[in-house]
Amino acid sequence: MLERGKMDRDMVEFVVIDQLVPKEHLLRKVDAAVDFTRLYEMVEPLYCEDNGRPSIDPVVLFKMVLIQHLYGLPSLRRTAEEVSLNVAYRWFLGYTLQEETPHFSTVSYNFRHRFTEKTVDKVFAWILDEVANAGYLSPRAVFIDGTHIKASANTKKQVKEHIPAASKHYAKELMEEVNADREAHGKKPFDDEPPTSPRKPKDNTSKKKLARRKKQGFRTVTQSTTDPDCGLFVKGEHKRQFAYEAHTACDKNGFVLETVVTPGNVHDSVAFDEVYDKVTKNFPQVEAIVADAAYKRPHICKKVFDDGRVLSTAYKRPQTMKGGHEWWKYVYDAFYDCVLCPEYQPLNYSTTNRDGYPEYKSDPNICGACPTRERCTHSKNCVKTVQRHIWKDYEELADDARYTPEYRELYKKCKETIERVFADAKEKHAMRYTRYRGLAQVTNWVKLKFVAMNLKKLAMWNWRHHFHLLIFRLFYSEYARNPVVS
């Protein structure tokens, strides 16, 4: 039987807002997980105590941003519209059905000018403390990786810029060991100070050296005119876009421990030091670092193993000549300090370059008559050069860890930890691209997104734990009153 619904839109009804929100709603779980009044202690120094108009409750502002990131809303303007229409959002903020909600520009202005990066860091650390107090944090093994975030910039609006080359964190330590290695082999140590240009150079060699040194101090980058802080991210032959890179660390339960945002053209290994230092400072109980092959660099291996930790990484494909001998056929002899080639001929030490690679070169008279020279070298002077980093032993320690069952199984968890964090952030929380511009704004945006993800996981786990505990208590009380003997 066809029934026509009534369109009585002027009906007056008395309701309780709490009854309109389902008992298992996500915001109920989030509200029960933490005490949001802790936010007042963090933002109190940012407000004047006895002057100015009464402000909007800062807890409400933070809750609105949490709603945006929890549900993957694209902008604060859209979030403000949803808050004014959604009963559950109003209940979470503590607003009645007819009370006016904050304007999106108010939220945007406060997070741009009032709440600084330190405020966001305090909120991030506070949620991690709540997770640790609940017993869900497990930082013994830390998983580190990076993911790109598409920037709000057009790839066609770009310019070429010459910028100073960034100095490496380990440059001083590396140069000291390079000079020590050169002196041990009777070589002259490198001069760290660049040579000054004389008024009347003696020969052209000095000019070439000065030009080469000056050129090495700068690099050419593609810079966006819309957002100069982002970088050109290149992956493969076709993917080129302006982006930011979120270098992130998480534990085995998927809780984000730290994140560092850089331009998209910064390699993962370059940003590793900052992420690693922050994680180990906040969580000194870290025992293992799990990362992919992009982090298998000599200085990273040395840094991790010198700290008494283990680096668990993947197999890194060697970059050898196509159709040539396998890399493992060139064996380093530590006793004689030489390299044996596949034809069992020694490659003796020649020099150590500034990058930390001792060079071992063959005898051209022997290589000229070698039957497998075409598979070894194509140089005109018939000299084969093999480089071996002075910190190569630390890379071999990482390879040894890769073959142990414990760390092999630990690396397999990357797909369900750090990769899962990135997948959820992009698919469920709208982190695939950002509408913000500037490194500072994007950094706060990413950290608040990870705050929402950590808080959501904490709320879900707390709710599930209390639910299972309630079921156990009901079952135990029923069993105590009426035990069943099978």
Spell out what each predicted region is.
Residues 89-93:
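Short amphipathic alpha-helical interface patches used for protein-protein assembly/oligomerization
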Residues 1-28:
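Hydrophobic alpha-helical membrane-insertion signals
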Residues 16, 35-38, 326, 348:
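Short, solvent-exposed coil/turn linker segments
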Residues 18-20, 53, 238:
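Short secondary-structure boundary/capping segments within folded domains
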Residues 23-66, 71-72:
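Basic, short loop/linker segments at the boundary and entry of helix-turn-helix/winged-helix-like folds
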Residues 3-4, 65, 72-85, 96-486:
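Anion-binding and metal-coordination hotspots
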